[in-house]
């Protein structure tokens, strides 16, 4: 459980009560005493996913998903980063023989065992599962019940036998993100009944397979790994029925959807996005942990990362990860970062975004400080003014600010009034004196605990878009970004109504419908956007992080698109 720190030795009882209420909004629900399995799950923290390798949809782990072949050195380097557990997703579909035996290729099963052993040798807790099989064929269970169940049972019979003598630091997850809609049903109760049948069958197969499997930790997922209350309650009922002390519940979490993909104007880590974390994990805690069932978040991240990690602005993304990590820690829930190759390079063993990893790593031991923004904008050709930001100190104390190793002077270069940090106009003028559009300097802010927070000082001018023509499959607006960065785009028909996909909002999904190409000097409008745009005129509003808004008009006629600058 996360402990709050205070610089005061004595606090009034009223303040103590208020703090406890803030930390435990559902504290009225008394928690069950910690179990051995709860201690096991807490020892797994932090965890990492070896995504898009053995779970590749295809016959070769290196071909279908583009990642290099797993090496022992990779596993050792993950352990060296401080991770205590690893989830190794495995897709079996292309490696299973025909009915009735559904024999798994010996070479593939041995390969899985090899990777598992490397992880165990690195002193990691290890989770293996049945991964993309969930949507490849298990999802057809309603229409192909007997075949799916026989195949599923055969897989787990062979896995259980292969690993029955492995130590208890190896756990089995029954199925990843189980779903059954390909069978024809969308009925929640029917889907839950099929999942319950799979989970119970999995449980019985493993428990009756001998060796260490009689007590091996088993991980059971909600329907689609979703943390909705209905689905968690259903899983709780299944686990209660099984009455086994070595069970772990799992859900996945990718944040409040509009923020996670950058749609509907949710460009910032705001109160609604934060409250989504609070509500979700209060419910997870009260459904499972408080009743003696430990929980691991088997995957977490942001959905926009599937496109690229720049879909969410850097500072906003850091605030999400910081708050998420500390809140689930309060709830005694362990987490496993989803990494399909976008975070930790599997040959150089370097993080693609060291600042993101530093924020995640700092969360393992405490809280980090953040700010209302990580961007300080100075408009070219205008009088520079003092600029203030709000610090989210999170119980910490600011210790220094520096640029390129030179410490800034309090009172001269900046002032700090409680948690309000003000950068003086004289310092901002100095930092942007070269007149280069874009990031001119990075102010590194250090605190007594946690990760550093970096402010990028940006010199910008109003972005300029130019008229152009193109097609629905290839349309790019020539853009002079002038040091600014794009936050979002609105699309509205001139005659009224929202244009493009998700027409319940005028703000379109970043990268899916539009994409800034800074190095090319373009804003690309994607085919997916035009697929749902009528043949008429659309007004676009491009909103930038400086606060600038630039209007643009497009006219679609069949596959032809004409763009006109305002």
Curated annotation (Swiss-Prot):
Keyword Hydrolase in record: yes
Classification via Pfam families: CBM46, CBM_X2, Cellulase
Molecular function GO labels: beta-glucosidase activity; cellulase activity
BP term (GO), one: cellulose catabolic process
Record carries keyword Hydrolase: yes
Catalytic activity: Endohydrolysis of (1->4)-beta-D-glucosidic linkages in cellulose, lichenin and cereal beta-D-glucans
Signal peptide boundaries: 1-30
Catalytic residues in the record: 177 (proton donor), 299 (nucleophile)
One GO CC term, this protein: cell surface
Listed Gene3D superfamilies: Glycosidases, Immunoglobulins
Superkingdom of origin organism: Bacteria
Keywords of this entry: Carbohydrate metabolism, Cellulose degradation, Glycosidase, Hydrolase, Polysaccharide degradation, Signal
Top enzyme category: hydrolase
Enzyme Commission number(s): 3.2.1.4
Family assignment from sequence similarity: Belongs to the glycosyl hydrolase 5 (cellulase A) family.
PANTHER family: ENDOGLUCANASE, PUTATIVE (AFU_ORTHOLOGUE AFUA_5G01830)-RELATED, GLUCAN ENDO-1,6-BETA-GLUCOSIDASE B
The protein, known as: Endoglucanase B
């Amino acid at each position: 459980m996360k402990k709050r720190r205070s610089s005061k030795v004595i606090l009034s009882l009223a303040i103590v009560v208020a703090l406890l209420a803030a930390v435990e909004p559902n504290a009225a629900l008394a928690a069950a005493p910690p179990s051995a399995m709860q201690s096991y799950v807490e020892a797994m923290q932090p965890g990492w996913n070896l995504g898009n390798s053995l779970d590749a949809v295809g016959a070769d782990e290196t071909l279908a998903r583009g990642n290099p072949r797993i090496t022992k050195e990779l596993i050792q380097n993950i352990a060296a980063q401080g991770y205590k557990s690893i989830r190794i997703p495995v897709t079996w579909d292309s490696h299973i023989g025909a009915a009735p035996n559904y024999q798994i290729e010996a070479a593939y099963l041995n390969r899985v065992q090899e990777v598992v052993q490397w992880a165990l040798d690195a002193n990691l807790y290890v989770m293996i599962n049945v991964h993309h099989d969930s949507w490849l064929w298990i999802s057809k269970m309603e229409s192909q019940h007997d075949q799916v169940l026989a195949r599923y049972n055969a897989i787990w019979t062979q896995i259980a036998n292969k690993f029955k003598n492995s130590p208890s630091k190896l756990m089995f997850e029954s199925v990843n993100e189980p779903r059954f809609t390909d069978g024809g049903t969308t009925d929640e109760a029917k889907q839950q009944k099929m999942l319950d049948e799979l989970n119970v069958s999995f449980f019985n197969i493993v428990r009756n397979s001998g060796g260490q499997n009689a007590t091996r930790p088993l991980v059971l997922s909600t329907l689609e790994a979703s943390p909705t209350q209905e689905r968690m309650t259903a899983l709780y009922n299944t686990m209660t029925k099984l009455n086994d002390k070595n069970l772990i519940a799992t859900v996945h979490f990718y944040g409040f959807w509009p923020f996670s993909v950058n749609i509907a104007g949710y460009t910032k880590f705001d109160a609604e996005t934060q409250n989504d974390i609070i509500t979700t994990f209060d419910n997870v805690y009260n459904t499972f942990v408080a009743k003696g069932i430990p929980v691991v978040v088997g995957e977490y991240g942001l959905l926009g990362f599937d496109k690229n990690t720049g879909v969410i602005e850097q500072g906003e993304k850091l605030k999400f990860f910081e708050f998420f990590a500390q809140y689930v820690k309060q709830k005694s829930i362990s987490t496993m970062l989803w990494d399909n190759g976008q975070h930790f390079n599997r040959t150089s063993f370097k993080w693609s975004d060291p600042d993101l990893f530093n924020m995640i790593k700092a969360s393992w031991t405490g809280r980090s400080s953040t700010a209302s923004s990580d961007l300080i904008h100075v408009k070219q050709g205008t009088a520079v003014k003092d600029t203030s930001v709000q610090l989210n100190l999170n119980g910490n104390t600011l210790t220094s600010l520096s640029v390129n190793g030179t410490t800034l002077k309090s009172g001269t270069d900046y002032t700090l009034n409680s948690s309000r940090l003000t950068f003086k106009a004289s310092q901002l003028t100095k930092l942007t004196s070269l007149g280069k559009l874009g990031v001119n300097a990075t102010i590194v802010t250090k605190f007594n605990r946690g990760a550093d927070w970096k402010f990028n000082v940006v010199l910008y001018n109003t972005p300029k878009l130019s008229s152009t023509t193109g097609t629905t499959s290839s349309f790019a607006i020539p853009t002079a970004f002038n040091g600014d960065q794009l936050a979002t785009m609105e699309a509205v028909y001139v005659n009224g109504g929202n244009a493009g996909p998700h027409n319940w909002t005028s703000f379109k999904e970043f990268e899916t419908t539009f994409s800034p190409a800074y190095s090319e000097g373009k804003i690309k409008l994607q085919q997916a956007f035009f697929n749902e745009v009528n043949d008429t005129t659309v007004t676009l509003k491009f909103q930038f992080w400086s606060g600038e808004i630039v209007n643009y008009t497009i006219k679609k006629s069949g596959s032809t698109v004409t763009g006109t600058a305002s």
